[in-house]
Regions:
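Non-catalytic terminal extensions of PLP-dependent enzymes
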Residues: 1-2, 6, 231-558, 562, ...
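Short glycine-rich or small-residue beta-strand-to-loop segments that form or flank ligand, phosphate
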Residues: 14-16, 106-109, 376-381
Length: 570
């Protein structure tokens, strides 16, 4: 652990053998007590909500941005300003004493699922004097310390003012993108003004750790640290970034080649990469010019992080005004866009929903990390060879060939057709894409999703109280179409997009009716297109008398809801 702390730039490091879900809970239990206020990235992992429930904390949410393509963006800098935080606290019904309160901890997911990396120095500086501790949940970002691309963009990176800055935690799923065994995780600590008493921290650590740990996991964490020490870590990450950049450039080149050479207009389509089309470069004389990304040397793209920084109000990212150097797009996290929607969120007349492509890839052994309605994420990791990225390109070409030739679905998805012969037995790939795209277009899915996250639900009770109601049987399963004015007892997370639409203790209200609309849409979609269902956390699926899927979720029983009158009941 001491060696790992040195390698990862921490004061102290702790090895954890039950994943970063447990690491997050350890951090919470080390510094948060019942009634403490915590600032929470709404784009958080479910383990953060579990931690809030376990500690009895009061969550105040930081809202991430979102573009018209449905991609989850960063929390804008002003969300971290004291004036904005104070406004949210004053409007929260869960904070009874608006004058005397403590904000113990702020939690930020870094990087986002689509590879947006924060300038952590800017966040730490803004939270100076506001919170005691900052936790960067970097489950998918443990490699950042080992390449200049990410300097200043991970929790342990910036040098902080030890007398004024908050103490910083980062949690890493070392098993995800480094070389540890499954469930291997690390907690890194960099002390600020309110230093961690490591004797007390150890009590929280032992609360969640087994007295009979799997020592192979611990050994693998040690090996992972050793692998990244010295120049080897830089070499491994450099190689990964190189492969990702080459893939990005190939995809762009292929798109242009198909557009130029394909005679049949209907076949002039390819997948787009979510990235800037051009980058502003500066020569030795200080002269600036715009270059197409596919024309820039890979070495330059690796050596200049500023080329990957999002500029304010640029059309390609769609997140509005961003401060210079605040957000960097991680080259190794590649978001692929399928045809069907413009950058402004306008649905085209034809398209190929991403779930069709990702199901095709999955059946051929290619793992897609995350899928939206018209996008999916490909993750380049250590050891990814040219052969593997070449296989991905080959399978995308195979899909295009099958689509252009309008192949029968039986040739594309034989298992799905076998399971649902009445639905798909005589259908072709183009017909499936047309039906699904038209359904999404008529549902105005891009607009609905944007509205879902534009208005935060009303907080009615503490998440810990909502969970107690669940345990005590004071809840009931409610059909999603009947959710109006009900208080949720669970966190509901639809995939796509992967952000909770409602948290435990929040109420479904007329102001947030789009949430219910989206859940109803998802239920209907799953019944219309079996085999391509959405993934839903927090919902229970039942079959009705017609063998149709019906969504239910746990809400506080109405008889108990009527008793909710005072702060003491929260």
């Amino acid at each position: 652990e001491k060696f790992a702390a040195k390698i990862f730039g921490a004061d102290e490091t702790y090895f954890v053998t039950n994943g970063t879900s447990t690491s997050n809970k350890i951090v919470f239990h080390s510094c948060v007590t019942p009634g403490d206020i915590v600032l929470i990235d709404r784009n958080c992992h479910k383990s953060i909500m579990h931690s809030i429930i376990m500690t009895g904390a009061i969550p105040i949410y930081l809202t991430p941005s979102r573009n018209s393509l449905g991609i989850i963006g960063p929390i804008h800098e002003e969300e971290f300003d004291w004036a904005e935080i104070e406004k949210k606290i004053n409007s929260s019904s869960l904070v009874s004493d608006k004058e005397n309160f403590r904000i113990k901890l702020a939690v930020v997911t870094n990087s986002t699922y689509d590879g947006l990396c924060y300038n952590t120095r800017k966040i730490i500086d803004r939270l100076e004097g506001v919170v005691d501790y900052v936790l960067f949940d970097e489950a998918w970002y443990a490699y950042a310390n080992f390449h200049p691309m990410y300097v200043g963009r991970y929790g342990m990176s910036p040098e902080i003012d030890r007398e004024r800055a908050p103490t910083v935690f980062t949690t890493h799923s070392t098993h995800k993108l480094l070389a540890a065994f499954s469930q291997g995780s690390m907690i890194h600590v960099k002390d600020g003004k309110k230093k961690i008493d490591h004797g007390r921290f150890n009590e929280a650590y032992m609360m969640h750790m087994s007295t009979s740990p799997q020592y192979a996991i611990i050994a693998s964490l040690d090996v992972s640290s050793k692998m990244m020490a010295g120049n080897s870590g830089r070499f491994l990450i450099d190689e990964t970034i190189q492969e990702a950049i080459v893939f990005r450039k190939k995809m762009k080149h292929l798109s242009e080649e198909i557009e130029d050479k394909e005679v049949d207009r209907k076949r002039r389509w390819w997948f787009e990469i979510w990235q800037p089309a051009q980058i502003t470069m500066e020569n030795e004389k200080g002269e600036r010019k715009r270059e197409d990304i596919e024309d820039i040397d890979e070495q330059l793209l690796k050596e200049h992080p500023e080329y990957w920084c999002l500029k304010g109000n640029e059309d390609w990212h769609g997140f509005g005004k961003l401060e210079s150097d605040y957000i960097l797009l991680d080259p190794i996290k590649v978001t692929v866009m399928t045809p069907g929607i413009t950058k402004q969120g306008r649905m085209r007349n034809w398209g190929i929903p991403a779930t069709i492509v990702t199901t095709f890839l999955r059946d051929r052994g290619i793992v897609v990390e995350k899928s939206g309605h018209y996008s999916f994420l490909i993750l380049f990791s250590l050891g990814l060879t040219k052969g593997k990225s070449g296989t991905l390109l080959a399978e995308l070409f195979t899909f295009k060939k099958l689509f252009d030739e309008n192949a029968p679905l039986d040739d594309v998805f034989p298992d799905i057709v076998k399971k649902h012969p009445k639905k798909y037995g005589r259908m072709t790939l183009q017909e499936l894409s047309e039906q699904m795209h038209e359904y999404l277009r008529k549902a105005r899915i891009a607009r609905v999703l944007k509205d879902v996250y534009s208005q935060a639900p009303e907080q009615v009770m503490l998440p810990a109280r909502a969970y107690s109601e669940l345990v005590n049987g004071n809840t009931e399963l409610v059909r999603i179409r009947e959710l109006q004015n009900r208080i949720s007892a669970v966190m509901v997370v639809p995939y796509p997009p992967g952000i909770p639409v409602i948290m435990p203790g929040e109420r479904y209200t007329p102001e947030t009716k789009r949430i219910i609309e989206y859940l109803n849409f998802s239920e209907d979609f799953d019944n219309r297109f079996p085999g391509f269902e959405n993934e839903m956390h927090g919902l229970k699926v039942k079959l009705d008398s017609n063998n149709k899927k019906r969504y239910y979720t746990y809400c506080r029983s109405e008889e108990h809801t009527s008793e909710l009158q005072s702060r003491s009941d929260l």
